[in-house]
Amino acid sequence: MYTRYSYNPSLGRTYVYDNKYYKNLGAVIKNANRKKHFIEHELEEKTLDPLDRYLVAEDPFLGPGKNQKLTLFKEIRNVKPDTMKLVVNWSGKEFLRETWTRFMEDSFPIVNDQEVMDVFLVINMRPTRPNRCYKFLAQHALRCDPEYVPHEVIRIVEPSYVGSNNEYRVSLAKRGGGCPVMNLHSEYTNSFEEFINRVIWENFYKPIVYVGTDSAEEEEILLEVSLVFKIKEFAPDAPLYNGPAY
């Protein structure tokens, strides 16, 4: 039996490997995988090279096109804790003829050809009482069965927090996007009801949106609900003049 002071022949015995001929197995496998991934990544990038000629906006709301805002309504709602309240149910108050007519006349001149690229539902939320400290919550569904009647109040289940500007924005564009209708002013003038159904809801989703707060008390909030139209404009056809000045 060896003590701490006795001699142990195995102490100090070492094995020296020449690193020139021996390599760590894990390092070899990792290096091979790294090379394989690099080759695959290069091939994938080459297939995407033709797309370098195009520009896209990270946020479609800030992309090319003109934003035209249509304020649908402003209301004060009381929201109880742990619940969310339905904001928009498209029952009719969102489609007041006077509001839409004024918007169409101001935003869509008769002489211009314009196309709706996207429609955003924008909900701005503000507390009505001062010195309240809570965050706004929101939840939405883009589509549902036509016969579905949404509940006015639901319990909070996996909502998303609204941003620092207290604005909740939802893009309503269907896959493919865009609204292939030119000269929207004349389309609207022909028939208001047909314009809403055939132009708006034929090309864009009709969403259901709920809002709430993370407060433990009942809160009173001011809601401003609006639709923002992303417009693509085309220059009108200029007539050709023949005369001494030209």
Swiss-Prot record:
Q: Identify one Gene Ontology CC term for this UniProt entry.
A: viral occlusion body
The Gene Ontology terms for molecular function here are: structural molecule activity
Superkingdom of this protein's organism: Viruses
Q: What keywords were assigned to this record?
A: Viral occlusion body
Q: What does it do?
A: Major component of the virus occlusion bodies, which are large proteinaceous structures (polyhedra), that protect the virus from the outside environment for extended periods until they are ingested by insect larvae.
Record family assignment: Belongs to the polyhedrin family.
This chain's protein is named: Polyhedrin
- Source organism of the structure: Panolis flammea multiple nucleocapsid polyhedrosis virus (PfMNPV)
The organism's taxonomic lineage, starting at the top: Viruses, Viruses incertae sedis, Naldaviricetes, Lefavirales, Baculoviridae
